[in-house]
């Protein structure tokens, strides 16, 4: 795989691949939520987080007053609570997590001290849809930190038993919570595995599901679950493939599809699935483009679009992809060109158009997060 120079390179890329461009969409009172939302972008090399007001109509980015905002040491992943009151950023070199209050009038953010301890080199965050628990992948300590979230203050409290182990040398770089909030899936960048955990109801305690971990391709760098919770998709950055596994909703167990893995672009590192579960978008770090696939709702098989023809050009070294809450736009964070590409999504065909630069951010972005409408 071009441009990946050992694990250090992979981790540095995850900062880019975890480009938590936390797109805070709609739902911000006083922000004319019917016409705009807010996007938050992590900029680890400048220890800051950029914020933009985004048009729901055109997808145009306009910098929020005061942006970029000071963050922790190398913030590379950001998520928002469902009420859009709080933002959380994983600080890779600080080994901690920052909590920010979101100003509902301006979209600005202010950090609440002290920061919360994490494992060694937290590089990815995920939250359940209820906003009850926050999960952090610690790449250097090969474990998962789990926190309960105070709905009133946003303060994090580590749950009993946290951090939870993966395997020695697993180097987890990506994780996602299933839509039901019952399961957590974690990608091991070094072992070619996905770990599956059940999430204790009310406790957040993790327990590996039967037969976990599950074998995927080489260098898994992103993991996603379809909205119906039938399939798990994994972007394998070193083998240029996408693994697809069926999900047993009663146990959380995964079973690889017969013809999996499927051919992808060059160095796929980030994925986004539309809310209807019809289309899958994959940022290809080495190809400087985005691949688009239609998804068979029955079999889970991805088929790359031919009309319009995939892949679609992005910026230089696209590391993160996300769909905004309107479902109309795909935003891609580009590491080397230091910008965000914006695409219009055709809801009928899944095709992408425009692809122009929505915003220049000055330093390498590493993740995008969006609010719910």
Question: Locations of the language-model features?
Answer:
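Predominantly soluble domains enriched in secretory-pathway, periplasmic, or organellar proteins
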Residues: 27-373
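Bacterial N-terminal signal peptides
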Residues: 19-27
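Bacterial N-terminal signal peptides that target proteins for export
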Residues: 4-20
């Amino acid at each position: 795989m071009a441009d990946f120079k050992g694990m250090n390179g992979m981790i540095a890329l995850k900062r880019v691949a975890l480009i938590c461009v936390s797109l805070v969409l709609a739902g911000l009172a006083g922000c004319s939520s019917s016409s705009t939302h807010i996007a938050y972008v992590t900029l680890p090399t400048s220890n800051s987080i950029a914020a933009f007001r985004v048009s729901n109509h055109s997808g145009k980015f306009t910098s929020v007053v005061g942006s970029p905002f000071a963050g922790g040491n190398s913030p590379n992943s950001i998520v928002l609570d469902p009420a859009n009151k709080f933002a959380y950023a994983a600080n890779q070199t600080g080994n901690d997590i920052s909590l920010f209050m979101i100003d509902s009038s301006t979209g600005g953010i202010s950090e609440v001290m002290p920061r919360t301890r994490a494992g060694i080199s937290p590089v990815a965050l995920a939250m359940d849809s209820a906003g009850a628990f926050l999960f952090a992948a610690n790449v250097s300590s090969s474990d998962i930190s789990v926190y309960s979230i105070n709905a009133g203050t946003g303060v994090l409290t580590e749950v009993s038993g946290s951090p939870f182990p993966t395997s020695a040398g697993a180097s987890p770089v990506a994780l996602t919570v299933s839509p039901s909030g019952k399961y957590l899936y974690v990608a091991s960048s070094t072992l070619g595995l996905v770990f599956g955990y059940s999430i204790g109801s009310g406790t957040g305690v993790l327990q590996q599901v039967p037969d976990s971990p599950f074998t995927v391709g080489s260098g898994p760098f992103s993991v996603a679950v379809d909205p119906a919770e039938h399939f798990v998709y994994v972007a394998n950055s070193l083998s240029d493939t996408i693994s697809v596994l069926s999900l047993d909703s009663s146990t959380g167990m995964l079973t690889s599809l017969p013809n999996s893995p499927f051919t992808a672009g060059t160095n796929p590192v980030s994925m986004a699935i539309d809310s209807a579960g019809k289309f899958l978008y994959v940022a290809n770090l080495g190809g400087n483009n985005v691949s688009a696939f239609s998804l068979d709702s029955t079999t889970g098989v991805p088929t790359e679009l031919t009309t319009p023809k995939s892949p679609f050009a992005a910026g230089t070294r696209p590391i993160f992809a996300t769909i905004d809450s309107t479902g109309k736009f795909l935003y891609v964070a580009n590491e080397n060109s230091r910008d965000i590409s914006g695409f219009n999504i055709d809801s009928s065909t899944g095709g992408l158009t425009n692809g122009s630069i929505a915003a220049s951010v000055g330093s390498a972005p590493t993740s995008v997060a969006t609010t719910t409408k």
